[in-house]
């Protein structure tokens, strides 16, 4: 199967075409540029069966509109900064949180590295004071390592002396080439921004892949 990237632009296709072309060449995927619709509800109509990744330029939208699109799309969204380059894809950064959906970061990092074996996955492990939360982090880390070892992926584990939130801030502020993988947190209301989204808004200086939770991976408990 040949996957597809859908790159959205606001006014002119030149805003995003070069980025989409470079990423498509790197991964061996097709790309398609679409003018972003006025309503977030119309975004799903732009997605095809093979669409695996969406691109948005950070500076093209207000933060409110950017999040409106990110939450309307049911695919991972790579938000690009102005200084994007091919070197960006040489490193995938995974800050490990305690929520179970953090495991999906490992799945996506593994998927991306399979299509671009030259990149390195950096797993950033926080130090949590609460033992229950620390155990949940260790569980997520063990899952990620199991997947990556099975795939013989290149990765390294970096232990931080900070909590998940402080580790995330540090990674978001890092200007060195790399993509930070971040889960899209659940929100109750369109005008409400969960804490990690507020951290992204305040601190992000580099590329971030925002991943929606895949509910098909979870079994509801009754």
Predicted regions and their residues:
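A short, flexible beta-alpha/helix-coil linker loop
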Residues: 126-130, 186-187
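Short beta-strand elements in bilobed, periplasmic/extracellular small-molecule ligand-binding domains
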Residues: 25-35, 120-124, 150-158
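Gly/Ser-rich helix-loop-strand patches that form or flank binding pockets
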Residues: 41-85, 172-222
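Short acidic/Ser/Thr-enriched loop-to-helix initiation segments
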Residues: 1-27, 65-73, 84-124, 139-147, ...
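GTPase G-domain guanine-specificity segment
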Residues: 129-143
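Conserved beta-strand termini and adjacent loop/short-helix elements that scaffold enzyme active sites
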Residues: 34-36, 80, 124-126, 158-162, ...
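A short, well-structured beta->alpha microelement
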Residues: 31-46, 160-168
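Glycine/small-residue-rich hydrophobic helix-like segments
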Residues: 141-186
């Amino acid at each position: 199967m040949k996957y597809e990237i859908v790159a959205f632009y606001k006014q002119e296709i030149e805003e995003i075409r070069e980025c989409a072309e470079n990423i498509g060449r790197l991964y061996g995927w097709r790309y398609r540029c679409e003018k972003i619709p006025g309503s977030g509800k119309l975004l799903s109509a732009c997605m095809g069966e093979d669409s695996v990744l969406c691109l948005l330029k950070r500076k093209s939208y207000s933060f409110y509109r950017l999040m409106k699109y990110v939450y309307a799309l049911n695919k991972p969204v790579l938000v690009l900064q102005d200084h994007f380059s091919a070197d960006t894809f040489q490193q995938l950064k995974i800050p490990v949180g305690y929520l179970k959906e953090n495991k999906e970061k490992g799945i996506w990092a593994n998927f991306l590295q399979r299509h671009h074996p030259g990149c390195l996955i950096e797993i950033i492990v926080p130090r949590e004071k609460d033992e229950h939360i620390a155990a949940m982090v260790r569980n997520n880390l063990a899952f990620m390592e199991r997947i990556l070892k099975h795939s013989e992926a290149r990765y390294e584990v970096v232990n931080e002396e900070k909590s998940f939130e402080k580790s995330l801030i540090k990674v978001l502020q890092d200007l060195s080439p790399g993509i930070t993988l971040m889960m899209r947190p659940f929100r109750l209301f369109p005008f409400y921004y969960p804490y990690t989204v507020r951290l992204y808004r305040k601190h992000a200086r580099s590329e971030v892949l925002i991943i929606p939770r895949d509910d098909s991976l979870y079994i509801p408990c009754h």
